């Protein structure tokens, strides 16, 4: 399998490109996504896929998440870049109630494909309302899957898994890792399975579990 050294955000972007080419029901929306997004993961998407599938929105995170819930029921596969994890609190009803629970509340015989991208943590100058680690919120709501990639390879592989997942996924990219670089597989079928641990060092005396 061939590899290329690239940045964490670029690896996320590669996954988006590959999956949008493969599946025309995927579209992305958020503030500034048509011009590359907050951290560059969406760079070039509007040029290739057009503004019908790469949609700039105003500053209303609740609207973005609500649109994703409705589009999911209609059979589309929305991706929402919320800009920062802090904004999970603004869109909480749509994410933690509607996206997470509608299938089960209403007996819907449909998948709820949706990926919500939350950049979390901080880097210089982000400010107190753009620096929270909100991934723990999603862990307490049945119906959601939560991922937090720690390197460029996982950023690509987990994004591809999230885009193929029939349940809503909260994809937490780490701001401080945004421009870190690593070897990324170029195989368009490379996926990191959600929910399967990577064993970094096998042993029998002690287990350390982290993310």
PLM-predicted stretches and their roles:
Residues 92, 195-196, 202-203:
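Glycine- and Gly-Pro-enriched alpha-helical subdomains that act as flexible
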Residues 135-136, 196-198:
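Short, flexible, solvent-exposed loop/turn segments with mixed acidic/basic and small polar residues
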